[in-house]
Structure formats: C-alpha cells, structure tokens
Amino acid sequence: MPGITREEVAHLARLARLELKGEELDHFAGQLDDIIGAVARVSEVADQDVPPTSHPLPLTNVMRADEVRPSLTPAQALSGAPAQEQQRFKVPQILGED
Amino acid sequence: MTVTDLVSYEDALASYDPVMGLEVHVELGTKTKMFCGCSTELKQDANSQTCPVCLGLPGALPVVNEIGVESAIKIGLALNCEIAEWCRFARKNYFYPDMPKNFQTSQYDEPIAFNGYLDVQLEDGEIFRVQIERAHMEEDTGKSTHVGGATGRIHGASHSLLDYNRAGIPLIEIVTKPIEGAGARAPEVAKAYVAELRELIKALGVSEARMEMGQMRCDVNLSLRPHGREEFGTRSETKNVNSLRSVERAARYEVQRHAAVLSSGGTIVQETRHFHEEDGSTTAGRIKDNAEDYRYFPEPDLVPVAPARDWVEELRKGLPELPRLRRARLKEDWGVNEHDMQSILNAGAVDLIVATTEAGAPSDQARKWWMGELARNANETGRGLDELPITPAQVARVAALVAAGDLNDKLARQVIEGVLAGEGDPDTVVEKRGLKVVSDEGALSTAVDEAIAGNAAIADKIRAGKVAAAGALVGAVMKATRGQADAARVRELILEKLGAEG
C-alpha cells in the first residue's frame, strides 16, 4: 500500500511554504496517510479497461480564437496587491544575503 | 567570487567527450496570451495587460489559444516530430514571484510534439543531425525589476517589482535529445542548431524569434565523460544564453570548466549557471530542484488537446521550404559563394533581397544595394536592415532607374539617401532633388566643349592618341554637371570631339 511518511509531509510542507510544528507533522502525516490509503482503494477496483482520468467531462479541444479582449486596468490589477511601487507588484527580497 | 580555473579547450577535448542538451524557448507571435485574451504587445504600460486568468485570481478559468496550439504543431512538424493524438497540460508548481499563479501551466509527460530531428549545416558544409526529444506548450513568466542592489541584480536587492504583462505569453519549449558525437565541434553544433531553429521559426511565421528581444532564449546543458565511457557525466545547465555567439561561447566555457574540475579530481555539481556576456564565463546559480519537487499534475481547468489528423496533415502541407534548403537554392540562383551567402544571412538580408528580385530587380543589383549602401546605413544608425524606411519595391525601382540609364550609381545613392530621409519614393526624390542623369545631348555637348576649352593641354594629349588622359576631362564634366552626367557617354563625346579612338 502506498503511504506517506512524516519526512515526506515535512518536505511537502516546505515546498508549499507551510510552517508546521512537530506535533502538526505527526497529526497530518497520520491523516494524509489515511486519505492516501482510501484513495488507493480506487485502483483496486479500476481494471485495465478503465483509463486514468484527470477531467470528469469527455471534452477535448476547447479552444479560443486569438482575439484580444479587454484587460484589467493597472489600478484594478494592483488593487489586491499588499504593496506596490511604480505601478508594479512589490515583493520582498527574493534571495537572502549569501 | 573566485576565479574559476580552466584547462585549455584542446586539453579538455583530449581527455573528455562533451555531451550537450539544448533547451530553446520560443515566444510565439500570437496576438493574445496562451490561456486568456490579454494582448501580448510589447513595451506597454506595466501591468496594463493582465486579467484574472493570468494573475491567477480565484475562480478564473483558462481557455487555450488555438493559434498557440496550431503554432506548436507547425513547429513540431517542421522538426520532423510525431504529433500527439491526445495530450494534456500540467501544472508545474513552484513559488517564485514572476509567476503569480504559483504554478506554470506547461506540459509534462504528454508533449504535443516528440521524437524528431533537425539537420543543421556546419561552417564547412557538413550536415549534423540533432535529435529532438520534444516540443511542448507552456507560458512565459512576468518581468522582475530588482531594486536596491548594484546594477539591477537580484543579489543584494532590497525588494523586487513585478510587471505581469509577459506572464502567460505562449512559449514553445524545444528540447533536444543528448547531442553526442560532436566532439570538439560541440560549441559549433550548438550555435548552428540555434541558428537553424531560429530561421525555421521565422520561416514558419510563428514568431519573429528575435533573441535580443528575448523572443527566443536558449539553455545549454553540458556534461563531459572520459573518452570511451558510455555513461553521461553530471551536467550543468547554463540559463538564458541569448545570442548565437553566446551559445557557442557558453558551451566552450563549460567544456573547459568541467574539464578543470574533473581532472583535478573534483565533482561537477548539478546546478543552474548564469552566463556573462562581458567575458563569456558562467557562474553558479541555484542548486537544481529535483523534478518531482515541481509536483506536476494534470491541469484540471483545461481539457485535453487532441489534434485531428486531417488538421495535422493540412498543416503539414502548408509547411514552408526548409531554411537550409532554401538557402542552398538561393545561393545557387544568385551564383554567390558560401562566404557571401553567410554574410547575407548574417545581415538578415535574404528575405529583403528575395522581395527585391520579386519586385523586378536582377539579384546582383538587389544584393549590391542591400549589402552595400543600405547595410552601411543600417550599421551606422544601429538598425536592422528590415527596420530601414525603404521597401524592397523601392530598391527595385532604384535599380530599374539605373538600368534605364536615368541614374548612375552616384545619383542612385543620393536617391536612396533621400528615401531613407523620408523624402518620398525614389521617383519623388529624383524629381525633388533634380537627380536625373543629364541625357540632354545639347547640354552634355556644351559641358564637354567647356571642359576641352578649359583643359587645352590635356585635350592635346588626347588628340595625340593618349586616350587614358580622357579621365581627367570626364572628371571635369562630371564636376560641372554635379555628377548628373552618364560618365560613359561623356567619355564617348570627348573622344569623338577630339577625333581619338576609344
């Protein structure tokens, strides 16, 4: 049975930029392991004739003509930004000092 | 930063065999972004071309741009790839401020095009086949401006500013299979491949592929292995190498650097490296994340793309002549040597010359003007030939006026100068500047008589049979007519009047 270890949860938390305390890692590792186990049961009933699916609707080729539509104004685009400068989104330092 | 020791290129090649992988990103020339209708026009106001989809706002639904898909298929076909019957987009998850969604919509294990090749011609004419692994669809990131550090670099910056106008512009990433067997010519192969790919993309009309504008960017992956070993060494990935010359230099530098590290008993770290135009060196960037850290998964907001076979075949039929074959054909037609053809190519003059001949000019005349006067002007004014305010049809008209004897070369140059200065089309410039060759025999005859009278000593020499002296009188007439006389006709008149045989 596939499962997930506490180390893997800690790794994923780091990738997702989530700060988890030790007891939270224990807690979520157990819960996630249960969930993965439950989902894995699907593959027990899915036989060769059932292809993996990523979309519930049997649709393909939904495309859009290459025609320009109005964009937001810069003010609208920036309205949710915690900080802005020179009509741009302002973000904290990307690289730490090294 | 420490100075990296290098071994000489020859020594590196004596011990090691280079293996390369090239990843090229091409920004498509679509009017709108890959998954939304925002304009892709360059140099617009910051954040004036964004919407909920490309900003990744909750609830926004992307829809794929059909020209984006069509362009990807055309590129795939031109690279002799198979086109997927069915493929999906995938989310590549990572946190970086240039991607407002916190994931890039890309393709993972189901690229739209795969398993192809591109034949490239090296400088000595040898054809080298570069195998293509895949070409897939994805989207560009936003543009960062780093504030507070030295010369805009990310190192030492206090904060960064983001403009998302570019975020979501369609990109096609083209990945080669490992390029083996190029040996010492690996850097040359890398350059020739990127050059050929650029020509191909332009010929397909899917992008202008201007490297200096970031419309085409290359990553050079390189590793060395000792001669005789099958297994690849650890590779470095030099990012954003953005000119043909830099591609060659980056590959060469990495060969020398790897060899220095390996032969001193060190190990190559798998990392991204930054290329520096100033001295052709590379420096370490971040240690590469493992692929699984991107946690790719199928994009649930987009449905699969399943290109109908008849559509694919229709696109295949519409493919243009391959640039390499077209070049060979034109070289033959024009009767030029490899070196001249290369100069024409480097100057970006091929299409202009073709258009000029199509407008009626003989190819030697079209070449002469584009590679001479016009190339000089473009060079002096820091423009591309295609940016000059003169059309191939106008150049053809100038050539026609010369052929008809209405202009001589000197006057033709003045006409071109006038057209470039915005004075109008060639006929208008001729009219306004009064540049017609003086073909009025009466006026010419008078000018010749005056020249003879004013240079009696020279005239005597010519009468005595010293025909070569006629040049001085021709010069005098040309001066008197401000260059507007037909020099050959002037010479004839002089000899005739002085009773000398030409």
UniProtKB/Swiss-Prot annotation, chain A:
Please verify whether the record's keywords include Ribosomal protein.
no
Q: Does the keyword ATP-binding apply?
A: yes
Keyword terms, alphabetized: ATP-binding, Ligase, Nucleotide-binding, Protein biosynthesis
- GO:BP terms for this protein? glutaminyl-tRNAGln biosynthesis via transamidation; regulation of translational fidelity; translation
Family designation: Belongs to the GatC family.
Lineage of origin? Bacteria, Bacillati, Actinomycetota, Actinomycetes, Kitasatosporales
Q: Report the protein's function.
A: Allows the formation of correctly charged Asn-tRNA(Asn) or Gln-tRNA(Gln) through the transamidation of misacylated Asp-tRNA(Asn) or Glu-tRNA(Gln) in organisms which lack either or both of asparaginyl-tRNA or glutaminyl-tRNA synthetases. The reaction takes place in the presence of glutamine and ATP through an activated phospho-Asp-tRNA(Asn) or phospho-Glu-tRNA(Gln).
As its record notes, the protein acts as a catalyst of: L-glutamyl-tRNA(Gln) + L-glutamine + ATP + H2O = L-glutaminyl-tRNA(Gln) + L-glutamate + ADP + phosphate + H(+); L-aspartyl-tRNA(Asn) + L-glutamine + ATP + H2O = L-asparaginyl-tRNA(Asn) + L-glutamate + ADP + phosphate + 2 H(+)
Q: What is this protein called?
A: Aspartyl/glutamyl-tRNA(Asn/Gln) amidotransferase subunit C
Which GO molecular function, any one, fits this protein according to its record? Answer: glutaminyl-tRNA synthase (glutamine-hydrolyzing) activity
Q: Which domain of life is it from?
A: Bacteria
Tell me where the signal peptide lies.
none
Q: Where is this region: Disordered?
A: 75-98
Give its E.C. classification number.
6.3.5.-
Subunit-structure text: Heterotrimer of A, B and C subunits.
